């Protein structure tokens, strides 16, 4: 049986018309039309050759048709799967065994099985009949038609499709493309990969031009390196200073006259306590000014009568004293009462609180 391909068929053509046209040269087994092409199966090979010779470019309904042998003839029937092969068997020995039934195109052994490609389908059928379930090198091998279509290894498929490059016309073992997808020219690959040889390091360690190029440009890990304590402290101080400036920038700059003069004074301790002037105790304050110049600027606030009776204090240092009879004098008592009755501090609390809250 020979399968013929008919191309460029007109739309008016029918299967009966095509069948009757080819039956002039031999028995037609099957006729199929698919869109603008079709297939005709002729029983005799000689009749098929006559049909090709006479009907090629034949004008049918005003259109020249193409008649030729089908190129997509199934060659899967020529590929045989041979199982249970002896591990000592070689490709040459297996090929010679199958060549007893016809020409062998390719023979590939994969582990304990193999694929054998016969040139003709009838030879493949004869090989199956003669070699299936027969002894070969001490093992009973099984021969059958291969049904695999995916070419995942050499020998799995026909010559029309290479499993490496996907092109037709050659087997995988004859493919010029290597397994990496490049043309198998090892000299060219070697020159491309290893042709540029760098000069050796003739300088000392750390003085080579290659060393400087690699490690002397930028330090991408500088931010992750451990810094000294002094550097960390300086960075923290600068950050705190900047934060204080940003925080104080939005606060009001208004201050009272008393507070401004008190802060601007460089000779007076800002935390020193001074008695403020009061009209009700002007005479007493004048009397205490001379005593305050020779004594401490702070006033003792020991209000416990027990400790006050036992303590030995200066006579006029703190605004009160003891007489010859060790009794509290009336003048000292009056001065002491007037001192604690007046308002000692008259500062603006909001301005002071805003001044110290930033720190």
UniProtKB/Swiss-Prot annotation:
The modification Phosphoserine is found at residues 86, 304. GO terms for molecular function: miRNA binding; mRNA 3'-UTR binding; mRNA binding; pre-mRNA binding; pre-mRNA intronic binding; pre-mRNA intronic pyrimidine-rich binding; RNA binding; zinc ion binding. Keywords: Activator, Cytoplasm, Differentiation, Isopeptide bond, Metal-binding, mRNA processing, mRNA splicing, Nucleus, Phosphoprotein, Repeat, RNA-binding, RNA-mediated gene silencing, Ubl conjugation, Zinc, Zinc-finger. Residues 196-359 are annotated as: Interaction with TNPO3. Its main location: nucleus. It holds the Pfam family RRM_1. Residues 2-72, 78-148 form the RRM domain. Phosphorylated. Phosphorylated in vitro on Ser-304 by SRPK1. Phosphorylation on Ser-304 is induced upon cell stress signaling, which alters its subcellular localization and may modulate its activity on IRES-mediated mRNA translation. Phosphorylation on Ser-304 is induced upon cell muscle differentiation. Disulfide bonds: none annotated. CDD domains: RRM1_RBM4, RRM2_RBM4. SUPFAM superfamilies: RNA-binding domain, RBD. SMART domains: RRM, ZnF_C2HC. There is a cross-link at residue 79 (Glycyl lysine isopeptide (Lys-Gly) (interchain with G-Cter in SUMO2)). One of its GO terms (biological process) is mRNA processing. A zinc finger (CCHC-type) spans 160-177. It is found in: Nucleus; Nucleus, Nucleolus; Nucleus speckle; Cytoplasm. InterPro entries: Euk_RNA-bind_prot, Nucleotide-bd_a/b_plait_sf, RBD_domain_sf, RBM4_RRM1, RBM4_RRM2, RRM_dom, Znf_CCHC. GO terms for cellular component: cytoplasm; cytoplasmic stress granule; nuclear speck; nucleolus; nucleoplasm; nucleus. RNA-binding factor involved in multiple aspects of cellular processes like alternative splicing of pre-mRNA and translation regulation. Modulates alternative 5'-splice site and exon selection. Acts as a muscle cell differentiation-promoting factor. Activates exon skipping of the PTB pre-mRNA during muscle cell differentiation. Antagonizes the activity of the splicing factor PTBP1 to modulate muscle cell-specific exon selection of alpha tropomyosin. Binds to intronic pyrimidine-rich sequence of the TPM1 and MAPT pre-mRNAs. Interacts with TNPO3; the interaction mediates nuclear import of the protein and is disrupted by nuclear Ran bound to GTP. Interacts with EIF4G1 and WT1. Interacts with EIF4A1; the interaction is modulated under stress-induced conditions. Interacts with AGO1. Interacts with AGO2; the interaction occurs under both cell proliferation and differentiation conditions and in an RNA- and phosphorylation-independent manner. Interacts with DDX5; the interaction occurs in an RNA-independent manner. This is RNA-binding protein 4. It comes from Oryctolagus cuniculus. The gene is RBM4.
